[in-house]
């Protein structure tokens, strides 16, 4: 649906070249809710602006719904843009226009009939839960209601793609949750592909099925949300995951336990999925290795509606200790594991 092929973007400011994007490649599949996460300055917003051609790539290709738009003119982009909706952090509503007129604006600009405009706007306001606010003005609405108006406006033209640039950053946690639920409903009801730009890993965890992690203009990690949360490969991905889920004990706790430890030991970090959480894993391990298994840390969370568990286990070692059987057990049970000592 959206594909970036070795995309780079360079800005020239005061005779200085700034590389906003460097050799970015990934694909957003049809019906994805695809998250792009990174800190400020990572290049996220520049990336999303390439999709609707608000910016043009310096190098590489940007493919949107089968069209290579890299070198499209504004005229050539008109039909493509009809299939792309966008919402922003600060809503971008017309304060002098009613809710109804704000939502209707794309249809008015497209010179649709009054009958069609009324029908379509009414449908969208009902979908976002603001039918009773149609005659009010933006200043009379809460932040969450303003974003719902913006979503209705983005959907009113029946787009195939919805771009969300930090759409929940200005909202409180409860309102953020309600907006994410609405966006998930947009995806499921209309089959709209959503590309989420955010710096909040909780947004990725709650709504996205796939994610790209950006740092300094580069995509440093991609994968399903479950893959990235279960085994983040890069330091930045690990840092983002740790903001919403504690996946291992604190360094101070490990240091204290190591100081108290008598004899040699081996530690394992394991990731247990929902289908495995009811299995007698610890009991099985005790029987396999013939010794006690210490649980140094355990935490449970929900990712994409599935319960997952992170555990840090410790085995005391002696001459009879054999880890081959333990490793084989984890592999047979499809339990992701990592030896950490």
Swiss-Prot record:
Q: Where do the annotations place ATP binding?
A: 38-45
Annotated GO CC locations: plasma membrane
Q: Where is the ABC transporter domain?
A: 2-241
The terms under GO molecular function for this entry are: ABC-type D-methionine transporter activity; ATP binding; ATP hydrolysis activity
InterPro entries per record: AAA+_ATPase (IPR003593), ABC_transporter-like_ATP-bd (IPR003439), ABC_transporter-like_CS (IPR017871), ACT-like_dom_sf (IPR045865), MetN_ABC (IPR041701), MetN_ABC_transporter-like (IPR050086), NIL_domain (IPR018449), P-loop_NTPase (IPR027417)
UniProt EC number: 7.4.2.11
Q: What class of enzyme is it?
A: translocase
Instruction: Report the superkingdom from the record.
Output: Bacteria
Per UniProt, which keywords does this protein have?
Answer: Amino-acid transport, ATP-binding, Cell membrane, Membrane, Nucleotide-binding, Translocase, Transport
Which cellular compartments is it found in?
Cell membrane
Which reactions does this protein catalyse?
L-methionine(out) + ATP + H2O = L-methionine(in) + ADP + phosphate + H(+); D-methionine(out) + ATP + H2O = D-methionine(in) + ADP + phosphate + H(+)
Annotated signal sequence range: none
**Matches recorded under Pfam families:** ABC_tran, NIL
Q: Please describe what this protein does.
A: Part of the ABC transporter complex MetNIQ involved in methionine import. Responsible for energy coupling to the transport system.
Q: What is this protein called?
A: Methionine import ATP-binding protein MetN 1
């Amino acid at each position: 649906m959206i594909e970036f092929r070795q995309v780079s973007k360079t800005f020239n400011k005061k005779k200085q070249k700034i590389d906003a994007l460097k050799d970015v490649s990934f694909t957003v599949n049809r019906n994805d809710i695809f998250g792009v996460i990174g800190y400020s300055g990572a290049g996220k917003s520049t990336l999303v602006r390439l999709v609707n051609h608000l910016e043009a790539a310096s190098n590489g290709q940007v493919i949107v719904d089968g069209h290579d738009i890299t070198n499209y003119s504004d005229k050539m982009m008109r039909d493509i843009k009809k299939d792309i909706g966008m919402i922003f952090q600060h809503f971008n509503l017309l304060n002098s226009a009613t809710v109804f007129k704000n939502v209707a604006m794309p249809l008015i600009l497209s010179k649709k009939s009054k009958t069609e405009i009324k029908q379509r706007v009414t449908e969208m306001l009902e979908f976002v839960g603001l039918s009773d606010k149609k005659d009010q003005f933006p200043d009379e609405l809460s932040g969450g209601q303003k974003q719902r108006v913006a979503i209705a406006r983005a959907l009113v033209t029946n787009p195939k793609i919805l771009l969300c640039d930090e759409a929940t950053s200005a909202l409180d946690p409860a309102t953020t949750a309600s907006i994410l639920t609405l966006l998930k409903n947009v995806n499921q009801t209309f089959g709209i592909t959503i590309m989420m730009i955010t710096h909040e890993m909780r947004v990725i965890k709650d709504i996205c099925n796939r994610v790209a992690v950006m740092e300094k203009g580069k995509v440093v990690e991609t994968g399903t949300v479950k893959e990235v949360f279960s085994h983040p490969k890069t330091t930045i991905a690990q840092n983002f995951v740790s903001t919403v889920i504690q996946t291992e004990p604190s360094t101070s706790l490990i240091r204290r336990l190591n100081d108290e430890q008598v004899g040699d030991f081996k530690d394992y970090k394991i990731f247990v999925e929902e289908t495995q959480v009811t299995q007698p894993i610890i009991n099985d391990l005790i029987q396999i290795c013939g010794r006690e298994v210490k649980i140094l840390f355990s935490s449970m969370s929900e990712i994409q509606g599935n319960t997952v568990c992170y555990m840090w286990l410790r085995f005391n070692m002696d001459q009879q200790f054999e880890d081959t059987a333990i490793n084989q057990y984890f592999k047979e049970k499809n339990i992701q594991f990592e030896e950490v000592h």
